[in-house]
């Protein structure tokens, strides 16, 4: 009979198989009432699942992240229940959990309107009040197919048909509504209290533009009303910080239908880009990287050798010329190997660090494109390090230092780190995987860094470390990565002469800090709400006069500041000074210089900031010292 080990170290013995709910009941009525699911030997299960052997059990409630995920998954099914009651002809597709919420894809002849969304949410609340039990039934593939044939649910039937014969299928019954899922789900709708339906959008079935366009209903759910309110507040703030909205206000960039997923950089946006690029260029030079440049268009044969053609050809833009097929590069790595392969390399030459601001194109689905955050044409701060196995840990350690140096310069101090290890399908021996994974984990541990392990999440060709930034709204953005690669150097014939005079294949480390320039600029704009640190601001100073008499003095000051390489503009419009100050403040210009008769006579400048701080009058040299001090801080002064 099972002995149940609890998280606090206590053990309970039962005379017969016991469910998770029965374990919770044995610990107290309060826990039983709050129980949503359970982890049995690390596996998340429904509360009704029997435990037949000795196990470690953790009861999951709404206070746990697993509990929130279970609640959100159950809410997706509740959408299905409500929609089928209100719109019986609707056909249900899939309803997964996503970050901060859930959605359900539905086929229905008529577009759901905002009023429909309100009606669905109202019906969901009515169903929640019924406090009905959610029943689980384990069925065969044949039984599941018959169930959904009876209910005329073609999308469910398609999913069932793709499930392996011996795999367990679970049906979840919400009164008259039945859905299919791996689970777990809440045992009763009393756990489904705090939620809100957010929006409706279009989504192709299976993400394939050749298939049916479905309607996707998004929702969010939380463990308490306080958490829901806080989330909605964050959404409201995120809406204000939307980089597309701010870019329009500041004239940074635009996109248009004639070039989907391609960025039209305006002068001010391009100024930000150039500052970013120059900073990364100078930083990489200090860390002994060689900057290179490789072709945009490369013959198909190279992509076949590298393995990209087989895996990514549908995402590549191709063209033909003189009976040859070419691809616009979706990534830079195969081309970097070509540069490494030029000339004989010795172990004494390693490590070799090749960096490129590589422009890539990927044929992303049009529906996924989103401003700077998801584009088709992007530039990576890409680099590849060719080294020996023994050099991997040292190179990873140096890269970690570089990553944190760069992120601090942009004002990001909260960095989350994940180490992804070997998947089931992989190349390379277990011995080399052991060495590589140990090199990565030892490099992280030597820095005293906290990191999460993601078993089985590495690429087939090697383990990797991912670096994610947390912005001022608590959102997490995966940016940096360093990836060990055993495969590509060998596939593309890279070699060096080792100390024993034998030819060896180098290890290749793929690494990026920003990810892509476009996306990183989008992150910066939203993190700072457009009020970029002074060193990044597209215009650092605007000089403006109070009257026409001050025009020449304004122009002289602008020329002096521009000669010192400060990004400066002059505003000589015949407008009131208050109007001009307000306009440039809304444009997020860090420093405003005002010249009136008094300043013109004294040779000083009146200075104020976009935050409204008034420094009064000072000599121009005093102002440039102030400016230099602010620029030197980079992003370390924080979010204003």
Curated annotation (Swiss-Prot):
What catalytic activity is recorded?
tRNA(Thr) + L-threonine + ATP = L-threonyl-tRNA(Thr) + AMP + diphosphate + H(+)
Keyword terms: Aminoacyl-tRNA synthetase, ATP-binding, Cytoplasm, Ligase, Metal-binding, Nucleotide-binding, Protein biosynthesis, RNA-binding, tRNA-binding, Zinc
Cofactor(s) needed for function: Zn(2+)
Any one Pfam family match given in the protein's UniProt record, by short name: tRNA_SAD
Under Gene Ontology molecular function, one entry of this record is:
tRNA binding
GO CC terms of this entry: cytosol
The cofactor remark states: Binds 1 zinc ion per subunit.
SUPFAM superfamilies recorded: Class II aaRS ABD-related, Class II aaRS and biotin synthetases, TGS-like, ThrRS/AlaRS common domain
Q: What is this protein called?
A: Threonine--tRNA ligase
């Amino acid at each position: 009979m099972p002995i149940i080990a609890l998280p606090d170290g206590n053990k309970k013995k039962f005379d017969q198989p016991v469910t998770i709910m029965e374990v919770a009941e044995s610990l107290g009525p309060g826990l039983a009432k709050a129980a949503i699911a359970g982890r049995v030997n690390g596996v998340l299960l429904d509360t009704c699942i029997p435990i037949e052997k000795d196990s470690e059990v953790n009861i999951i409630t709404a206070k746990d992240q697993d509990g929130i995920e279970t609640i959100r998954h159950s809410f997706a099914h509740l959408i299905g229940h409500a929609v089928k009651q209100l719109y019986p002809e609707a056909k249900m597709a899939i309803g997964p959990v996503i970050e901060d919420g859930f959605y359900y894809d539905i086929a229905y002849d008529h577009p759901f309107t905002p009023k429909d969304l309100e009606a669905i949410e109202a019906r969901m609340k009515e169903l929640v009040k019924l406090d009905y039990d959610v029943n689980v039934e384990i069925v065969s593939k044949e039984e599941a197919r018959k169930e959904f044939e009876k209910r005329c649910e073609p999308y469910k039937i398609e999913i069932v048909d793709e499930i392996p014969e011996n795999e367990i299928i679970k049906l979840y019954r919400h009164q008259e509504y039945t859905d299919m899922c791996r689970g777990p789900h809440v045992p009763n709708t009393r756990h489904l209290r705090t939620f809100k339906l957010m929006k409706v959008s279009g989504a192709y079935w299976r993400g394939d533009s050749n298939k049916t366009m479905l309607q996707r209903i998004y929702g969010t759910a939380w463990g308490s009303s306080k958490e829901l309110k806080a989330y909605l507040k964050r959404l409201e703030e995120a809406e204000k910080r939307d980089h597309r909205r701010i870019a329009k206000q500041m004239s940074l960039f635009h996109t248009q239908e004639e070039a989907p997923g391609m960025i039209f950089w305006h002068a001010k946006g391009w100024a930000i880009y150039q500052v970013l690029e120059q900073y990364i260029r100078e930083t990489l030079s200090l860390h002994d990287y060689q900057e290179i440049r490789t072709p945009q268009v490369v013959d198909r044969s190279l992509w076949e050798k590298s393995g990209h053609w087989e895996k990514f050809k549908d995402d590549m833009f191709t063209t033909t010329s003189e009976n040859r097929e070419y691809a616009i590069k979706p990534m830079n790595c195969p081309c970097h190997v070509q540069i490494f392969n030029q000339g004989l390399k010795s172990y004494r030459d390693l490590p070799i660090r090749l960096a490129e601001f590589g422009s890539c194109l990927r044929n992303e689905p049009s529906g996924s494109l989103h401003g700077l955050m998801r584009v088709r044409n992007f530039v990576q701060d890409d680099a590849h390090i060719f080294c020996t196995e023994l050099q991997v840990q040292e190179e990873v350690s140096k890269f970690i230092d570089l990553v944190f140096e760069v992120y601090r310069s942009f004002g990001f101090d909260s960095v989350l780190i994940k180490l992804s290890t070997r998947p089931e399908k992989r190349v390379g021996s277990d011995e080399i995987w052991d060495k590589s994974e140990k090199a990565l984990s030892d490099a992280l541990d030597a820095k005293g860094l906290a990191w999460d392990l993601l078993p089985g999440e590495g690429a087939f060709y090697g383990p990797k470390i991912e670096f994610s930034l947390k912005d001022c709204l608590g959102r997490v953005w995966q940016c940096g990565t360093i990836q060990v690669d055993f495969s590509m150097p060998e596939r593309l014939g890279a070699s060096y002469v080792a100390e024993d005079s034998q030819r060896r294949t180098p290890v290749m480390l793929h690494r990026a800090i920003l990810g892509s320039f476009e996306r990183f600029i989008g992150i910066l704009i939203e993190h700072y709400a457009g009020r970029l640190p002074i060193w990044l601001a597209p215009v650092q100073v605007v000089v403006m006069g109070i009257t026409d008499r001050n025009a020449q003095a304004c122009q002289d000051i602008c020329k002096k500041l521009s000669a010192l390489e400060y990004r400066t503009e002059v505003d000589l419009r015949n407008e009131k000074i208050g109007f001009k100050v307000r306009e440039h403040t809304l444009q997020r210009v860090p420093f405003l210089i005002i010249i009136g008769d008094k300043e013109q006579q004294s040779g000083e400048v009146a200075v104020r900031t976009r935050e409204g701080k008034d420094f009064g009058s000072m000599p121009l040299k005093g102002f440039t010292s102030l400016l230099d001090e602010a620029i030197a801080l980079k992003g370390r002064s924080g979010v204003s």
